[in-house]
Amino acid sequence: MTEDLDLAAHWDDAYAQGDATRSWFQDAPRMSLRMLDAVGVTAADSLIDLGGGASPLAGALLARGFRDVTVLDISAAGMQYARRRLGPQAAQVHWLTADVLSWRPRRHYRAWHDRAVFHFLTADEHRQQYLHTLDTATAAGAIAVFGCFAPDGPQRCSGWPVARYSPAQLARQIGTKWLLISQDREEHITPAGTTQPFTWIALRRQT
C-alpha cells in the first residue's frame, strides 16, 4: 500500500506542473486511433485505457460513438485534467484510480490500450504482475495495443529508468497467449520540441 501511495504521489506531483508541459503531452491521440483502426476495434467494443490520466483518448473515443470506455490511472490528479476537458461528457466514462499492478479487474474488456505505462516496468516481477492483470481483464479474441519507447528512445522519463523495445521484443514480453498483428513507429514531439521514438504494436489474444 505504501508503494502504491508513493507512486500516486509521484504522478500527482508530475501533473501538478501542468499536463501540457509534460513530455507525454499530445493534443490528439493520432497513433492510438490509427492502431485501433488497423485492427478493427469499433465503437461497439469495450475499451480500457491504462495510464490514461489526462490523455485525450477517452474524449476522442466518445466522439466516435464509443459507449463503454474505462480510464485507469494511479493519479487522480491526472484524470482530473481529462474530466475537466470533457465537461458533462466525463460522466460517460468509467474512471478508476488504481495501480495496474495491484488492481483486480471485475470484468473483461474487448480492447486494452497502454501508451507509455509498460515501459516503466523495468523489473520482471512488476511485468509479470501487469501481465496477470492483462490476462484477468481480457478473454480470447481481445485486442491489446501498446506504445512504448523504441530502442533509440529515451533511457529515462519523469526521473525514472525505462525499458525500450522493438516490436518483436515487446511482443515477446507480452507473451505467447498474444499474437502480434500490427506494428508501427512514432516520432513523438514533446512540448519542449524534442523527439521521442515510440514502438507501437497491436496483439490479439489467442487463448
Task: Describe the function of each predicted region.
Residues H113:
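A conserved beta-strand element that flanks and buttresses the S-adenosyl-L-methionine
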Residues A116-F120:
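Short catalytic micro-motifs in class I SAM-dependent methyltransferases
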Residues M1-R107, L121-A137, I143-T207:
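Class I (Rossmann-like) S-adenosyl-L-methionine-dependent methyltransferase catalytic domain
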